[in-house]
Amino acid sequence: QFNVMPERYKDYSLLELYDELDISMRYIAYYTEIPSPVGLKYTDKVKINEKEVDSECRLITIDTPYGELTREIRLTSDRNWRTSRSCIKTREDIKKATWLFRNTEFYFIEENFDKGDKFIGDRGEPQFFLPRSPYQSLHVDSSWMTLEDLIYAITDLPSEIEELMNAIDESYDRLYEEIISCRDKVRIINFGENIDAYLLSLKYFEEYLVPFWEKRSNQLRRAGIYTHIHIDGHFRPILKYLKDLPFDGLEALTPEPQGDVLIEEMKEYIGDKVLLDGIPAILFLPIYSREELYSCMEKLIRLFHPRLILGISDEIPEGVDEEGIERVRWISEYCKSFKTGKGDSYGL
């Protein structure tokens, strides 16, 4: 059930729950009610209008010199507004969107980062995720295109779609420059790409994703900022690329039984990169035993420690019962005993 905690924890604040379980925090603007440190603004030329169709449907229209871009959003069962019809369908729509991004600028809000840093305190290193690469932005952010429409556009209108991707990339310039100017406090950055290798071809992976990452991640790394990338889908087709990706860490790689790769294969292919997370989320559901969770956790620690920030790939399932949360506590206690050299199958 959405937005409902098990009875034992129903009155806990987010920070109280983290402290009760003795676990670390990572992201400053994810379920924290802290505003994102990534801002977005348009030039005065951009006009955006929102029209309510009914209580659960709205139309958002963006005026451009080439006509309107319109997307439909609907209120879903989790009470969030989500895109139900994307806005780029035709060659003319691509032209409109290119104009829009030429009049769009992302920027860094240092004040929001400071708020998040204060909120997290000593519970972890404050981090946030960047806007996605142009390819991922166009279809993962479904307000723009469906995956099917993107693939057709790349095939039929390559120059137009690449011009749009360039416009998206350039809209990030100020953001990266301002982050780098705050490198004394911003030390780790996430590329929140949400990669699933079965939703892209290796050709597009090499042509559109890797070059963007090399440009932008290395821009940050040259300034002394560590980077990691969020790969929370299937990733067997890209195993051979992992060790050479321009990141210090790989976040949310998900092994079997939820993903499509063995833990041993992850170890073989990621080289000396830091693994963030690694425990499949479904192991916190009652259909899996603590013994199965322990086996996975112990293997991750044995193979990846000390280049490991143990966590859930990529988050605990919504609607878990009290046992699911108690498994988080149990892992925390195990890890503390592991640090003292006393780790065993605690609590099984």
Question: Where are these predicted regions, by residue range?
Answer:
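Active-site loop segments of alpha/beta catalytic cores
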Residues: 3-9, 63, 95-348
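A generic structural motif
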Residues: 27-33, 85-89, 345-348
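Short, low-complexity intrinsically disordered segments
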Residues: 28-29, 40, 79, 97, ...
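A contiguous, low-structure linker/loop signature
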Residues: 44-103
